[in-house]
């Protein structure tokens, strides 16, 4: 007990020392990012190496009989197989094979461990939702959205937002995945996303939930938010993201935010692609681990990069506020640590302020403000995320 307490105190003292210094922000370019020895940044090197080995060992794979004929890394096959139980499950956006398990551990802004192919641009699935909520946050900060509790419909010139059911839906509800938005986008009806297995018409029969009454993870509704944001900015969302977030944090030019083959819309007489909020039907954000780490470092500093505020602190406060119907979820895609809550995605007593951006695969950007820590982990089994985080935090001396 005493040894554990002393170790915790030492970690807190080092974290305090790190915060007392001017925060380090890497210059553009993967090679320009300064590396530091793990021990000098408060890690037990052997324990950190073991945590990294754990992440590599627990790569997401198919059952052996399927892995033998179609490796899980071939996302052009594994993604359609994952969603084959859904009606309207066919991909309509790009898919590509992924790389090997990869990741980065960053403390105090410095890289202390990296593995795999962190420079490789891969699908990131639902972490795309985190990028989307950042862009919606920019619209709110700019005053283009007056209040997140405003109804979305008056901002959008699209009849699907003006039905009796959808008209009262608010921005806040869409961001928290409690909107219950009902309709069809790009050939995908909302009822066809994640129905009960063996009962493909279950959501169609049940009908839409009342707006704000239930949390439902639904990519059609996420895509509706992306379309609404496009109507607000009246410019392609990837352009906004690049100018306002990714270029200022020094991200590479290699990331791509895809829409679908059929998601072109006309705004002010110009044809634009409405991007997707994930890779469910293909598309979404394709990005490297290094660039994901820059997003994580921006999150660690609550929207500030090297003295420049890119996104308001108020937006991060809202993003990190638990929702009424999903206490482990803030705005998309902020998964919140819930110490003491059974069944929580993360239940970490010594990192109460921790949160993560999560996508299928699993892709994870884990952020612990208490430890001045960002971890990017790609292609780890979903059931092993929490165990990896436990090992990582235990490696802090």
Per-region residue spans from a language model:
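Active-site-proximal alpha-helical segments within enzyme catalytic domains
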Residues: 130, 134, 221-228, 283-304, ...
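Active-site Gly/Thr loop motif
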Residues: 263-279, 283, 321-374
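Active-site SXXK
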Residues: 44, 109, 123-148, 174, ...
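Catalytic-site signature segments of enzymes, centered on catalytic residues
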Residues: 110-120, 183-262, 283
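Active-site-proximal loop and beta-strand segments within enzyme catalytic domains
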Residues: 34, 56, 63-95, 124, ...
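Bacterial N-terminal signal peptides
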Residues: 7-16
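Active-site helix/loop module of the DD-peptidase/beta-lactamase fold
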Residues: 142-181, 233-281
């Amino acid at each position: 007990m005493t040894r554990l307490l002393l170790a915790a105190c030492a970690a807190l003292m080092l974290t305090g020392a790190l915060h007392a210094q001017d925060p380090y922000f890497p210059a553009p370019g993967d090679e320009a990012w300064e590396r530091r020895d793990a021990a000098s940044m408060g890690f037990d090197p052997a324990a950190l190496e073991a945590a990294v080995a754990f992440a590599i060992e627990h790569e997401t794979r198919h059952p052996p009989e399927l892995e033998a004929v179609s490796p899980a890394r071939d996302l052009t096959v594994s993604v359609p197989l994952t969603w084959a139980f859904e009606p309207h499950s066919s991909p309509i956006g790009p898919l590509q094979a992924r790389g090997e398990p990869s990741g980065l551990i960053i403390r105090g802004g410095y890289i202390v461990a990296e593995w795999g192919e962190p420079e490789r641009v891969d699908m990131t699935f639902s972490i795309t939702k985190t990028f989307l909520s950042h862009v919606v946050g920019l619209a709110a900060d700019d005053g283009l959205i007056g209040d997140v509790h405003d109804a979305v419909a008056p901002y959008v010139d699209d009849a699907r937002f003006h039905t009796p059911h959808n008209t009262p839906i608010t921005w806040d509800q869409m961001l928290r995945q409690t909107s219950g938005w009902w309709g069809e986008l790009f050939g995908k009806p909302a009822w066809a996303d994640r129905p009960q297995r063996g009962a493909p018409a279950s959501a169609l029969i049940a009908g839409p939930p009342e707006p704000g009454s239930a949390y439902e993870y639904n990519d059609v509704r996420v895509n509706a938010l992306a379309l609404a944001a496009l109507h607000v900015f009246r410019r392609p969302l990837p352009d906004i993201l690049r100018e306002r977030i990714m270029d200022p944090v020094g991200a590479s030019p290699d990331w791509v935010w895809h829409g679908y083959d059929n998601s072109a819309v006309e705004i002010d007489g110009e044809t634009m692609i409405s991007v997707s909020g994930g890779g469910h039907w293909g598309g979404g954000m394709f990005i490297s681990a290094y660039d994901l780490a820059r997003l994580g470092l921006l999150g660690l500093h609550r929207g500030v990069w090297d003295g420049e505020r890119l996104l308001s602190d108020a937006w991060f406060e809202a993003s990190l506020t638990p929702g009424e119907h999903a206490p482990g979820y803030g705005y998309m895609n902020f998964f919140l640590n819930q110490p003491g809550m059974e069944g929580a995605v993360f239940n970490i007593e010594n990192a109460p302020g921790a949160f993560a951006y999560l996508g299928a695969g699993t892709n994870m950007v884990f952020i612990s403000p208490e430890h001045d820590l960002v971890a990017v982990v790609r292609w780890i089994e979903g059931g092993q995320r929490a165990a990896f985080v436990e090992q990582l935090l235990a490696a802090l001396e």
